[in-house]
Amino acid sequence: MAERAQPSRPRAAGSPRAAGSSRAAGSPRAGSPSAGRRRADPARRAAYDVLRAVADRDAYANLLLPALLAERGLTGRDAAFATELTYGTLRGRGTYDAILAACSDRDQLDPPVRDVLRLGAHQLLATRVGQHAAVATSVDLAKDVCGPRPSGFVNAVLRRVATRDLDAWTEIVAPSRDIDPTGYLAVRHSHPRWIVEAFRDALGEAAAELEDALAAGNLRPDVVLAVTPGRADGKQGQEPEDPEHHALPVPPDATPTRWSPYGLRLAGGDPARYVAGGQAVVQDEASQLAALALTRVSLTPPERPLTGEPGHDRRWLDLCAGPGGKALLLAGLAAGRDARLVASDVRPNRAGRVRSALRRAGLTPAVVAADGRHVPWRPGTFDRVLADVPCSNLGSLRRRPEARWRKTPEAVPALAAVQRELLDAAIESARPGGVVAYVTCSPHLAETRDVVTAVAERRGDVTILDAPAVLAEVPGLHASDPRFAQFWPHRHGTDAIFLALLRRE
């Protein structure tokens, strides 16, 4: 049964209820020198600055926000509040914009004012910040970043927003569920209409789960680590035979992931001490399982092994290795089987990061900067090949909420063309009897099923394997084509990772 997502109602650090005070965080104390000149508090200002950078410079919130918090010395509850404001506002933007439009008599808003209003709407509709504090601090923020002129407008609009809760507003501003169910879900769950349609298509016969899938995309994801095999237990390459048995000792601030024997879910959410020492990388559990699936498939021995060449199951390839999470897991497992992984990425800087990550983990790197479509090695060189291809990232909207507003349906065909080329090159790199794993962080059928079936049919020298059977311990992997495995956040608590396994004949 699908896990129904519950709405997040975080206690906001710096809000009157969170702080136990009627004074909003960051506002001056009575009698202080600046008491007559209210300024935006640091947490709200940090969230605003990230929103503007996302809009103006195409910045990534997950990269910019931690650096900004460190630069401004925000820690503890202030950092947590800034994080909630940033990600919550980005996730809910579509819904908030529809509500703000209903509360404003202006056809267009200046972008800075609009972001102030979005932050205010999120506080009013999705956090425990009190109404007075949410409105007053938004007015202070508007004065700080836009000057005094729009403050009255911000005050009036947010007071209108505060007259109803989120569910009541949704019923007013969303299209009728009966007349336009796609439009209703798009507004209710803050996803562009085309993404709602893409998810419905990907769910296929399970389309009744669509609302659960969209709601899960708005939940805050856990921080999950993939620990390099051999770093924690000294047993490189030995995946436990019993999937119920975890391969690693579990530290007190973590819990094992449900299915990956190398996954740890952090309670505290700070992975720095593990990542810096080379013990682990941040990696979603579904991504770990996709890499593990490649290592589980039995190989057909080569018909005519070349004299002097490494024998059966000795050469593995990660074709699109950056930023290196799957490469670390594969390299650790390969070392335990007397095999060696070659990691390749088209961008030299990403290839360099993969090399550094492998070295930190104590692994001998074999890293190549090369376009995966035009590889420098001979055809048939590798026994196992991972093609974790560039994609629309529609499967990781929990982690990159701004991506839903940047991607367009017009970009998908060009991505699919590159994906077909990369899968073709991956198959060409595998020897006869070797195995290829095709992986995307998107459930869009044009990037998943359609790519694999088109390449397989055109080539005629590959067999599509039963991927869900290889990951038999994981329930609910069925996709529109039963040979493929599709993870979903509402079913598995993971990103929406797609996996196909192919054997070259």
Positions of the model-derived regions?
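S-adenosylmethionine
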Residues: 1-505
